[in-house]
């Protein structure tokens, strides 16, 4: 995603109805150790993708965000879409920033987006509610 020229070539050579965006670095601990790697890869890569999509007229995107965008100190799972966001690590920050960027694209560039906020895929919450 960080190679805008390659993205442009791919989008010009093939016809797509939309993009399912799962690409990102995703280790919370690593993001705390090397936040700039996460900012560059996740945020700048997404900006490249959205810019190329906009330039070729592709406006549909499904974005894989994360439950790490929620304020875990104020909210108790299960979360709802209206719960407060407040990230606790650089990984979550990159996901929330990308959500805001997508919101801007929807408002100002006629994009259509779906954002999925996943929870821990490893196992159930100790409360038994998830």
Task: Enumerate the language-model features and the residues they cover.
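Conserved Rossmann-fold cofactor-binding substructure of NAD(P)-dependent oxidoreductases
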Residues: 1-18
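Short, glycine/acidic-enriched loop or turn micro-motifs at the edges of active sites
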Residues: 2-3, 24, 120
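Helix N-cap/beta-alpha junction loops of NAD(P)-dependent oxidoreductase domains
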Residues: 4, 27-29, 72-73
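A generic secondary-structure signal
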Residues: 9-13, 52, 104
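N-terminal Rossmann-like NAD(P) cofactor-binding module of classical short-chain dehydrogenase/reductase
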Residues: 18-20, 62
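Conserved NAD(P)H cofactor-binding loop of Rossmann-fold oxidoreductase domains
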Residues: 23-26, 65-66
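Catalytic helix-loop patch of NAD(P)-dependent Rossmann-fold dehydrogenases
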Residues: 33-48, 55, 59-60, 69, ...
